[in-house]
Amino acid sequence: QFENELNWKVHFEATGPEIYTQMNCQIDCFISGIGTGGTIGGVARYLKKSQKLYDLDVCVADPQGSGFFNRIRHGVMYDHLEKEGSRRRHQVDTLVEGVGLNRITKNFGVNEKYIDYAYRIKDKNALQMARWLSNHDGLFLGSSSCINACSVVDYVREFKLQGSGKNIVFIACDSGSRHLSKFWKEALNIEEAALINSLDELI
């Protein structure tokens, strides 16, 4: 599924049009993580190429240890954990599962030109977002969804978009029920004093 281009083509033919229709054609930013690269690649290509949303910002949500942040921001597929003397068996040392790599998949490579920005999300912030979404919105989401949500906050902050009315779409791609033994185990251990009271405290 990493190299099979039917992956991104399905999202080009189905997910992209679904988002475009449900948002009444009004989308300013789309945010997703990269696992195979199929979701972000297919949706980005559909919105930018087929619907000609040239002003749309497409952003990658990247966990710590993954190389896509530097690939998008600086053109180099690299993370500091790869430097000489720091290589380890489990390269992507993060609680976040399902997204983040240190290689370019075909699904990502053929659609890279449609991606604009990337945000590096630390485990701590993803865990805080998980608790925030559960406590305030009743959403029990997994780790990949939570780094996507964190990237929304980063994007809004970087471009000073608070109260702008911009339409930002992110993918809630996994349920917390599939992350009970690792991610949510840590999320539930966050002390009450460390929980955030507003999204402004998150990033």
Q: Model regions: which residues?
A:
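Active-site/ligand-binding loops adjacent to catalytic centers
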Residues: 3, 49-143, 182-203
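Glycine-rich ThDP/TPP pyrophosphate-binding loop and its adjacent helix/strand module
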Residues: 10-55, 61
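Short beta-strand segments
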Residues: 1-2, 33-35, 60-62, 169-173
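A glycine-rich, Thr/Ser-enriched phosphate-binding loop motif common to dinucleotide/cofactor-binding enzymes
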Residues: 1-18, 142-147
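Short glycine/serine/threonine-rich phosphate/pyrophosphate-binding segments
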Residues: 33-44, 68-69, 144-152
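A short, acidic, amphipathic alpha-helical segment used as a generic capping/interface helix at domain edges
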Residues: 125-128, 133, 149-160
